[in-house]
Amino acid sequence: MQRYRTLAGALGWGQMLISIMTHIPSNRSLIAVAGFCWIASTAPVASQDQLFLTLATGGVTGVYHPAGTAICRAVNKSRSEHGVRCAAEAGSGSVGSLKQLRDRDVDFAIVQADWQHHAYLGTSVFAEFGPMADLKVVAGLHTEMAAIVARADSGFMDLSDLKGQRINIGPAGSGSAATWGQLSQHLPWSEEDRAAITQEDLSGLGEALCSGEIDAYFVVIGHPAGVIEETQEVCPVQFIEIGAGISEKMVADAPYYRAAEIPSGTYGEHNAIETIGTRALLITVEQMPAHAVSTVLRSLLSDIERFRTVHPALTDLDGAQLVEAKTEAPLHLGAVQFYEDQGYLP
């Protein structure tokens, strides 16, 4: 979990000393060794205690990656003061990031609340792994909403018209693909009706839709979404609503979903688009030092004005919203301490 990356830590003092003595002529070895020992004895202690963190995000065309990059940028601005450094990694999405966190391949992750729920309880696609009981929440970010996008001339009116059509639901491991799996449980479709569904990433979706390679695509994302705006630059689009009937069933089945609306005008639409929504969360594991968690939160809040400009979905984010992350998984101790100090928790 703690990635200490110093030259001495990588090689070991003894190995470095042997390397020096091996590669320096013998008549200068004593001077070299003496000089090396002086450098080692006077090296700043802080350089040996740097904590390197990795943050799993998502595809570069969504909200998660720019948000994660901005969080790490905020942390790194003051790294000489708190001794923490951060790097954001692009990935396949929520499910993939949760598996990385479970395997300790990353230290933090930005994921959808629904898949954090399943990972914590060991249900759905995480059933084979069992509960991830050490999963902890750090902060709530923006609201993610599902969108089903089709060409304006498709003639589709509602979800029933998509039966048997070529729908891209996002790559395996993405929150979008997993959420489609939940939604499709409420659709009376046969295996044959689902046979044409594809799982490609977001890049090139606009071209694929407008050229007729696919008939529609499904994404769960913060809005306005770049992938949808890019599609509109290629051809006119329409949105297929997830009606109240299915929304109510999904909310009844799972508390992490809620009925939602993409506001009118977001994509030039005259009316709001009925859909479902869930929260994007910043998460970690219990073993992460409280100092690291509080440092990430303090850095984010201190740079919140810049953070809001990263994506329109983050425009209204503030400290009070960060703590609004109601899930089965509890807040990390470092987050609790930070929010209490800031007055966001009683």
Residue ranges and their predicted role:
Residues 3-7, 18-31:
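Bacterial N-terminal signal peptides that target proteins for export
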Residues 38, 44-87, 133, 305-346:
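N-terminal hydrophobic or amphipathic helices and topogenic motifs
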Residues 113-115, 123-128, 154, 191-283, ...:
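Pocket-lining segment of extracytoplasmic ligand-binding domains
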Residues 165-182, 255-324:
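Ligand-binding clefts/hinges and TM-proximal coupling segments of bilobed small-molecule sensing domains
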